[in-house]
């Protein structure tokens, strides 16, 4: 076991020369986890150009302690290969120029 404690601002700049194909991988072996913890502050994932892709071999769980807001600049498509259940204790509002429930 080893712990490293550092103070101050630090930045890791990968592929500063902008060479195509210089990818950076973090791989963790079987039976271990990766945890990222911020005690007070934000976690920001940003791509200036490109996508953010998440692939899970099992369940994908999200727990939000406050509000959940999503803004989509293009279209939104959801495909479910099973059932969908939404449980809401408050009101539900759907707005659109046209809403087709059973097209």
Label the predicted regions.
Residues 1-103:
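Right-handed beta-helix
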């Amino acid at each position: 076991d080893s712990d490293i404690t550092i103070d101050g601002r630090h930045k890791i700049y990968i592929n500063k020369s902008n060479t195509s194909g210089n990818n950076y991988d973090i791989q963790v072996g079987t039976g271990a986890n990766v945890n990222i913890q911020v005690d007070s502050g934000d976690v920001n994932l940003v791509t200036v150009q490109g996508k953010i892709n998440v692939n899970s071999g099992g369940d994908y769980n999200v727990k939000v302690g406050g509000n959940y807001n999503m803004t989509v600049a293009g279209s939104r498509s959801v495909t479910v290969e099973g059932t969908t259940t939404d449980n809401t204790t408050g009101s539900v509002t759907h707005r659109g120029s046209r809403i087709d429930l059973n097209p």
